[in-house]
């Protein structure tokens, strides 16, 4: 087993290292999208992701939101607290299990969500103009494969 404290036998070409490239791409895309909604709606990236998940899958508990958006519990909890305070999200009662506290968008939250979704979809469409239709299908298929394989690798570590 290699010693992680020893000098590496080869240099890491960061600019071609897949995890780095994916992270940078995600950050650039996320920041560009954030620039569209941050000012008008005063939302952080995490807050919008929580709202997007609830807009699509509600009701969800905070833990379920975290699983859907692949984000740690602390970040989700903070975002949920801010959204609750602003009246964009509300807790619902789970009659079957009183320990559960599912979340959903409030009427105000649904209004904000409805105004951001077209901006997000328009940005996605502009981003995809860099690819032709075949490349887009390939990108989607390859992204799905890498996502599934990364999950398998993480479970098998």
PLM regions: where:
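Active-site phosphate/pyrophosphate-handling residues
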Residues: 17, 49, 74, 126, ...
């Amino acid at each position: 087993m290699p010693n992680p404290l020893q000098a590496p036998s080869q240099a890491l070409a960061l600019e071609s290292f897949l995890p780095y490239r994916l992270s940078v791409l995600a950050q650039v895309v996320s920041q560009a999208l954030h620039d569209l909604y941050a000012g008008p709606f005063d939302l952080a990236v995490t807050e919008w992701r929580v709202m997007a998940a609830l807009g699509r899958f509600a009701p969800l508990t905070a833990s379920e939101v975290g699983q859907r958006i692949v984000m740690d519990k602390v970040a989700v909890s903070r975002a949920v607290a801010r959204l609750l305070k602003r009246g964009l999200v509300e807790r619902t009662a789970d009659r079957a299990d009183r320990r559960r506290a599912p979340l959903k968008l409030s009427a105000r939250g649904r209004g904000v969500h409805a105004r951001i979704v077209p901006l997000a979809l328009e940005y996605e469409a502009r981003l995809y103009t860099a690819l032709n239709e075949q490349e887009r299908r390939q990108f989607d298929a390859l992204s799905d494969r890498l996502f599934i394989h990364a999950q398998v690798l993480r479970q098998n570590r």
